[in-house]
Curated annotation (Swiss-Prot):
One of its GO terms (biological process) is single fertilization. The keyword Transcription regulation applies. Residues 98-117, 177-223 are annotated as: Disordered. This is Mating-type protein MAT-2. It holds the Pfam family HMG_box. Its main location: nucleus. It comes from the Eukaryota. Signal peptide: none annotated.
Amino acid sequence: MDSTVYSTPPTNSISLAEAIKIAEARFEAAVQGCKDDWHNGNDLVILQDNIPQLFGGILVEHFKRCVGEVCGFPVELTVMDGGDNYHTLVQMPKNNMRSPQVVSSPQSAQTSPSEQTSINLKAVAAGLKKAPRPMNCWIIFRDAMHKHLKAEFPHLTIQEISTRCSHIWHNLSPEAKKPWQDAAQSAKEEHLRQHPNYKYTPRKPGEKKKRQSRKSKRAAAMTTAPEVLQFQLSPKLIPTVPEVTDEPPLAANPVTANGNNACPEDVSNCFDPNVFPEIYPEAPMAADFFYNTESIRHSLLDTEFDIDFNMDTTFALFDDEMLAFRDGADGDATLPSLFEDTY
C-alpha cells in the first residue's frame, strides 16, 4: 500500500469572488493530485481538508465522479479527526497497470552471458534474502499519517508524530478504520503471492538484547577510549631508509702484509683481556661447593669398593722407596721392587 499527502492552503477572510476562485483551485488541485497518485500506483491519498464540509454535497459527488473516471471505479471518502484539524482519506482501487509495458525488440531480447549471470545472481540473492513481515492496518495508517504530519508540521519529532498518529487512530470510528483494514488485507494477499513459502519467525528474546548490548559496548569503547583506534607507531619502530647523497664513498686504506709494517699500539691493546669489559660476568661461587662435591665423590667410592677410601691412609700403605719421584730423590733413583721386571 502506497499513499501520498497533498496539502491545501488555509482559508482566510476574503471576498466572495476570491473565495470561489480559491475553492476552484483547491478542488482542481485535489482532483489532479488523486489522479496523479493513482497513476503512480497509490490507492490511498490523505488530503489536509474536510472535503465534504469544504465543498458540500454537490461538489463532493462531482469530486468522486472526476476521480472515478480515471480509475474506472467509484472512490470512497473518509473523514478523519486529527485533533487540531480534519483530514480526508481518498480510497481508490488498486492500479495494477501503472507501469507501461515495453515491447522488446529482437536486439534487446538478446542478452550476453555476463548479463544473464548477473540477473541469475540477483535472483538468487533476492531468494536468499529474508522476506519482510506484511504490514498491518496500524502500520499502514501510521506510515501515511507520518508523511502527512511531517509535511504539515515539519518541527515535530518522530516521537511526537507517533503520539499524534496513535491519538488519531484510537479516535477513528470503525467505519473510518475500514479502509485501512482493507488495505492491510490487500497487502497481506500481495505478500502471500510474492512469498508463498513465507513463515513468520519471531526474533529470539536474547538475540535482540545481545545485539543491543554489543552495539552499546562498541559505542562505549569508542567514547571512553578513542585513542585505541587512533594510535601512532613509535619512531623507534619505523624502519629508517638510508639517505642517498652525492658524496663519494670513503676511500679504503689498504694495508700490505709484510715484515716492515709495525703494529700500532692501539691494535695491540685489543688483545689485552683487561681492556674489554666482561660481557658475561662470573657469578661468585662458594668454597663449600668444592667440598660438597668431593665429599659426594668419596662416598660413591666407599659404596663401590666397600672400604674407607681416604687419600691419607692410602698413601701411608706405600713405603717411601716406592715413590721414585718423591721430594729429595736422587737423579739415579731406581724403581722399587714392585715395578722391577721379574722374568
